[in-house]
Amino acid sequence: MAQQGQQGQMASGDSNLNFRMVAEIQNVEGQNLQEQVCPEPIFRFFRENKVEIASAITRPFPFLMGLRDRSFISEQMYEHFQEAFRNLVPVTRVMYCVLSELEKTFGWSHLEALFSRINLMAYPDLNEIYRSFQNVCYEHSPLQMNNVNDLEDRPRLLPYGKQENSNACHEMDDIAVPQEALSSSPRCEPGFSSESCEQLALPKAGGGDAEDAPSLLPGGGVSCKLAIQIDEGESEEMPKLLPYDTEVLESNGMIDAARTYSTAPGEKQGEEEGRNSPRKRNQDKEKYQESPEGRDKETFDLKTPQVTNEGEPEKGLCLLPGEGEEGSDDCSEMCDGEEPQEASSSLARCGSVSCLSAETFDLKTPQVTNEGEPEKELSLLPGEGEEGSDDCSEMCDGEERQEASSSLARRGSVSSELENHPMNEEGESEELASSLLYDNVPGAEQSAYENEKCSCVMCFSEEVPGSPEARTESDQACGTMDTVDIANNSTLGKPKRKRRKKRGHGWSRMRMRRQENSQQNDNSKADGQVVSSEKKANVNLKDLSKIRGRKRGKPGTRFTQSDRAAQKRVRSRASRKHKDETVDFKAPLLPVTCGGVKGILHKKKLQQGILVKCIQTEDGKWFTPTEFEIKGGHARSKNWRLSVRCGGWPLRWLMENGFLPDPPRIRYRKKKRILKSQNNSSVDPCMRNLDECEVCRDGGELFCCDTCSRVFHEDCHIPPVEAERTPWNCIFCRMKESPGSQQCCQESEVLERQMCPEEQLKCEFLLLKVYCCSESSFFAKIPYYYYIREACQGLKEPMWLDKIKKRLNEHGYPQVEGFVQDMRLIFQNHRASYKYKDFGQMGFRLEAEFEKNFKEVFAIQETNGNN
């Protein structure tokens, strides 16, 4: 029995052990599942906004590549999406498919990848969606989102300025903090009370390296999670940047780091090695004497970083927000009654400066390390476009706010204090830099500090992208600026990042530049010049505008109305200076010049055409107007009407005033042959009818027949002129070359003939003869009476000459009958439509001419029954 009881106890022990192991495994799996799966409201919000997210992602890189690198999508799926891009599928459509794939396994890691810093910089439209996710996270599970365990392994998506209440802060006090504490400046959110802020404290940092605790904090800005640890004299910094503009000073796990300043590595070394700066001890005594509460607090010289065991320089703390950052809720607040909390300064748009700090810090004296290297200094300068905070002047422990010794004028120059720098051990003089605070003037330039990257432990080397929300708050925090001794920021060893700025040309800026021109030499200082700390340099905005941009180009000459009139008079007199008023423009021979060449123009020859040689030079040679222009050296102008002059006047002016005829443009194909008649009398065909078309009797660009003297427009001839054919004969000459002896036949036989080339030529000749008649112009186009309903009731198919010409050129008539029927249809419709005598006679004459030519060309035998 005892043995059986012992075996039963062992079995029960094993079962309990197995049960505990299974419970622990299930607990771990539940925690992992809880960490991976998002709450239902956040998942639903993601699913409802997939279209907006896909629209914000405008290009594949870096979003798609980041998902592939984090194994959220497979390599095969990645190649599938790339193939879609190569097939010109819209990016938004492909991104929607990608988000649909992420929806299947949606979790916190997907949100962290989606709203990463790189993606928010590459796709600015994601910023608004990111803030919407923050609001949803805050509304549904604020405590879960701020859990200490969650801060290190998932992004924090609570909205800026909407943190937990003070109860959540009190719950954080009992949480154990690791020895490698992450120190940062505390931040009293609107939801926090000053009492809760006072209860938060960090233990002093011990040995070991600082932990890296990345966190995606909301509100946009720098997550100042610092790992400042003294391990054999070395300090390690692990900053983490966030994808927004506002600098957020927040501790890990909501643990207050107000005692970071009092327990900074520099002070620890000072306690071990003794304070090596007599000036610092004097400053500490002065601070104790000035402030009643200062007796209970340790003063911390932010400008005097101490030396570590290994002699490596410590980086000074940075209170400078990045460009475009807000200083909201991060101003001069003191917690725990022990050490002053760092203050952030911000520049309001109106030019006023919000309260910077609760106490006056001495930032002037950089210490020298054991190796002689200067310490990196603290920068308290605001970036461009930063906004003020509503809570700038609040104190958590009732600390006094000091009055400002320098203030920013609303419309004028800006005063900034310049402090002397001591020499380092190598005797090198450190450069001075002054912070210039600008008024809200269009086109005001930036100071050198706006382009300088923050070099403190919290901001280190990262940059925060600009955001539109960084410029929302403005004049609420306009006030005075505390007295801060500005130290040199040019010894940080980092290159200045130049920033392109829109070149403004407002009239107010230009006017201010002219008004303050007299003060330029007094206010501008050479770079690197040392100025005493008591002297203030007033720098006008006009000087700043001249630092970068100057108006390019030559200054324009301005003329009054009288000056313009005088110029016009001088110009008109100069144009008549070389005119010859004694020339008789009505004479048949006119003296002409082109450059240095002189000649005589014959009007009668010019009337024949522009290709006729009508200008005879002094040496007896004849030239066409174009050749004479080339002879005079004006070949590039290609306008002889302006290049060739008569008495100082161009030939165009003579043609416009009727002194000279405007010659027609005739294109000569080749040299004309002289035909010999039977009586051996020579006739020059070039001298007959060279200025008008045989069909329309109009000038212009004409083509000459190589056999006869007739000329035609390209489209007037039937068929159209073949310019490339050599020799080219008109249809009149071709009809003469056709066999003259034809047997007479009946009209019915002619109409039944097929449209062979010979019959095609005869039909074209008949139509051209009709066009040569003056009455044809009325029947060439569609008559307007076809649009009258009453007139068109008894008509057949509308027909006109151009329509027949088009069909004939396209060889649209298979027989001669079709051509003759269309011609007679024109006259039939005319007789049925027009009842007036004048118009009817016009149609009768043209019809009679056609019938006459038809019988002659086709040799139709007349009968008594047919006309």
Swiss-Prot record:
Q: Which CDD domains match?
A: Bromo_SP100C_like, PHD_SP110_140
May I have one GO cellular component term?
Answer: PML body
Segment Disordered: which positions?
Answer: 260-341, 365-432, 486-580
Annotated motif Nuclear localization signal: location in the chain? 495-514
Specify residue ranges for compositional bias: Acidic residues.
323-341, 384-397
Question: Subunit info?
Answer: Interacts with PIN1.
- What's the protein name? Nuclear body protein SP140
The organism that produces this protein has a lineage beginning with: Eukaryota, Metazoa, Chordata, Craniata, Vertebrata
